[in-house]
Amino acid sequence: MQLIIATRKSQLALWQSEYIKNKLSQTHSDLEISLEGFKTKGDVLLDSPLAKIGGKGLFTKELEESMLRGDSHLAVHSLKDVPSFFPKGLVLAAISKREEVNDAFLSEYYESLNALPKGAKVGTTSLRRRMQLLALRPDLNIISLRGNINSRLEKLKAKEFDAIILAFAGIKRLGLEKQIKFVKKFELDEMIPAASQGALGIESIDDKQILKYLECLNDKNAFVETHIERDFIKTLEGGCQVPIGINAKIIDEKIEIRAIVGLPDASKILKEKRMIDKQDYAKAGELLAKEMIAKGAKEILKEAESMI
């Protein structure tokens, strides 16, 4: 059987799609798998911060359209870029084993966030990262930084920034740790990641035979953790364009959950942390979101949107 994977054309997206292609080929020798590259709206509009472009599916819509036209069968996404709702005819078929979820500090000159001088220029487009950076270091000059991983690293090396912040998963997948002098992972209590960070989401057409082939890609722990995180985002009705962080981490038969919402300038922050029994995961994200809504989370996010 022939399978066509729709993919973005960035180095990281191609790595992720090749990784899934190889996993499928190892398990199913009868599959012939090829990749079809696309540029998404999020890849093309690099002049504006993501929050200002707005809308859901900035990195997924063109791939979904390809599947709906019948030009491809599945797409591999960074799950954090995937909206909670899918077009009719498409499903989230599998969630891969998670890479490390942490954000990372990268610099050619300073070994950590604390080592940065007052007013240092730090590059990130994420409002979630901006908020948490300013909570840790209110004196920093946070500057918007768009583009793929390699172009961001080039800007760092060209001394446009004193440091930049990236998801550690992407750096590790592309083997880039040794290219930068200082790479330091943030602790989860310092910087709560985006929902589903470090996981790959495999979206496909709703076809029984194809879904059967894709079952081998599923990771139970990643499913449980990202279920909590995506339910939290869904209940809050937040996307990647607002300052929300949520992380669920399985520890034996327990799950540790951290969540944060706030304003981009860190002037208001609501933060929660709790431990639950693993068996109670199904409603955990929704319940935590409702607790935070009762404490004013929705009003904070509405105010955050007005600041963008």
From Swiss-Prot:
Details of cofactor binding: Binds 1 dipyrromethane group covalently.
List of residues that carry S-(dipyrrolylmethanemethyl)cysteine: C240
Listed pathway(s): Porphyrin-containing compound metabolism; protoporphyrin-IX biosynthesis; coproporphyrinogen-III from 5-aminolevulinate: step 2/4
UniProt keyword terms in alphabetical order: Porphyrin biosynthesis, Transferase
Gene3D superfamilies: Periplasmic binding protein-like II, Porphobilinogen deaminase, C-terminal domain
Any GO CC annotation of this UniProt entry: cytoplasm
Family annotation (CDD domains): PBP2_EcHMBS_like
Catalytic activity: 4 porphobilinogen + H2O = hydroxymethylbilane + 4 NH4(+)
Cofactor(s) the record lists: dipyrromethane
Organism superkingdom: Bacteria
Enzyme Commission number, as recorded: 2.5.1.61
InterPro entries: HemC, Porphobilin_deaminase_cofac_BS, Porphobilin_deaminase_N, Porphobilinogen_deaminase_C, Porphobilinogen_deaminase_C_sf
Molecular-function GO terms, alphabetical: hydroxymethylbilane synthase activity
BP-aspect Gene Ontology terms: protoporphyrinogen IX biosynthetic process
Note in the entry: The porphobilinogen subunits are added to the dipyrromethane group.
Protein family membership: Belongs to the HMBS family.
HAMAP family: Porphobil_deam
Subunit comment: Monomer.
Function: Tetrapolymerization of the monopyrrole PBG into the hydroxymethylbilane pre-uroporphyrinogen in several discrete steps.
The protein, known as: Porphobilinogen deaminase
